[in-house]
């Protein structure tokens, strides 16, 4: 039986740039560094970075695949400004219904898509039940 997410590992082209991003911008706690690796605790998750300089990274820009972190509504403006102040690549978000809450989509230095979201799974399901009758819901 699966218990939980164990860790998330990102391949990065420059370990120092990525350490700066995850520690100094996203405020992750740096746990260890090695020649080609760094571990963080971020939002209760173990985030691993492995430096791999010679792999293609072009396809990542065409995918909606991302990791979303929860933030409070009251912190939305703070985080948006923090990302802007640190010249983070903020992506154009999709048009949202207010019931779907707020999100900021952005990328790390290697183009991995991340999201800061103010909603919960329950918010999303309730919104979809109200607004999307074509969807099938299971218990």
Swiss-Prot record:
PROSITE patterns the UniProt entry points to: VOC
Q: What residues does Mg(2+) bind to?
A: 7, 66, 115
Pull one GO CC term from this UniProt entry.
cytoplasm
Q: What are the record keywords, sorted?
A: Antibiotic resistance, Cytoplasm, Magnesium, Metal-binding, Transferase
Q: What is its EC number?
A: 2.5.1.-
Catalytic residues per the record? 115 (proton donor/acceptor)
What GO molecular function annotations does the UniProt record carry, in alphabetical order?
magnesium ion binding; transferase activity, transferring alkyl or aryl (other than methyl) groups
Q: What is its main location?
A: cytoplasm
Question: Biological process GO terms, please?
Answer: response to antibiotic
Q: What cofactor requirement does the entry state?
A: Mg(2+)
Pfam families named in the record = Glyoxalase
Give, as one word, the top-level EC class: transferase
Q: Which residues form the VOC domain?
A: 4-119
What subcellular compartments does it reside in?
Cytoplasm
Quote the subunit structure annotation. Homodimer.
UniProt function note:
Metallothiol transferase which confers resistance to fosfomycin by catalyzing the addition of a thiol cofactor to fosfomycin. L-cysteine is probably the physiological thiol donor.
Which family does the similarity line name? Answer: Belongs to the fosfomycin resistance protein family. FosB subfamily.
Q: What is this protein called?
A: Metallothiol transferase FosB
Q: Which organism is it from?
A: Staphylococcus aureus (strain MRSA252)
Kindly list the organism's lineage.
Bacteria, Bacillati, Bacillota, Bacilli, Bacillales
